[in-house]
Design a protein with these regions (language model features):
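Hydrophobic, aromatic-enriched interface-forming segments
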Residues: 75-77
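Glycine/threonine-rich flexible loop motifs
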Residues: 32-49
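Short glycine-/acidic-enriched loop or helix-start segments at secondary-structure transitions
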Residues: 12, 32-35, 80-81, 161
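Conserved G/P- and acidic residue-centered "switch" motifs that form tight phosphate/ATP-binding loops
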Residues: 72
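Short glycine-rich anion-binding loops that position phosphate/pyrophosphate groups of nucleotides
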Residues: 27-30
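Amide-donor transfer/coupling interface in amidating biosynthetic enzymes
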Residues: 2-20, 24, 47-64, 91-211
């Protein structure tokens, strides 16, 4: 189900009850005021209505412990919603940064990332280093409380994070949807779907219990 950019309170409540998980995709830059910064000259225009919807949806789904997967902007949204900050433009703010803003085609590897030992992404991949694509000019700067790193680019840019106290809350900076045919990338979506199914089973079992 793809959500429209505007939902009233009743519609939001219905969506939260209907859906067992949420995927937050890539897109426009997040308004810097949401992480306590003024807009720099390099920050692209934001979409206030999208920010409003997605931050509200995230906080409510987080309270309900719904599974959530964030891709690119989605990782950045999770981080800022939980109290972290962002680099507004890597080339200007991180000397020596890789060129993270690749051109088409996106279904190819442009750099490697190192997966943190003991994290679920490392367990999924079964190896320390994997290749990824890269299509972003912003990135996590200060990681939010409650999130732990899962992957790093060679230049020190955070590439993935998760919340260990949640059933499934992963943020991925690259775009695994273009690399789905590789197990370590397609498996991210499979784990998310499996977590949503687990949540659905719990809901059904709870509703079946008398009283």
């Amino acid at each position: 189900m793809i959500l429209p950019p505007r939902l009233d309170e009743e519609e939001m409540a219905q969506i939260l009850n209907l859906c067992q998980g949420f995927l937050f995709p890539g897109g426009q830059d997040i308004e810097p005021a949401r992480y306590g910064m003024e807009r720099s000259a390099w920050c692209a225009p934001s979409l206030p209505q999208r920010d409003l919807l997605e931050f509200s949806l995230f906080h409510r789904a987080y309270q309900m412990e719904k599974p959530m997967l964030g891709i690119c902007r989605g990782l950045q949204l999770f981080n800022t919603a939980l109290g972290g900050t962002l680099y507004q433009h890597l080339p200007a703010e991180l000397p020596g940064a890789l060129d993270h803003d690749m051109t088409k085609p996106y279904d190819r590897v442009v750099h490697n990332v190192r997966l943190e030992k003991g994290t679920p992404l490392r367990q999924l991949a079964g190896q320390e280093v994997i290749g990824v694509n890269s299509y972003h000019h912003q990135a996590v700067h200060k990681l939010a409380p409650g999130l732990l790193p899962m992957a790093w680019a060679p230049d020190g840019v955070l590439e993935a994070a998760y919340a260990p106290d949640r059933q499934f809350l992963w943020g991925i900076q690259w775009h695994p949807e273009y690399l789905w045919h590789w197990a370590e990338h397609g498996g991210i979506f499979q784990m998310f779907v499996d977590s949503c199914r687990t949540t659905q089973v719990k809901v059904l079992l709870h509703s079946a219990v008398p009283g």
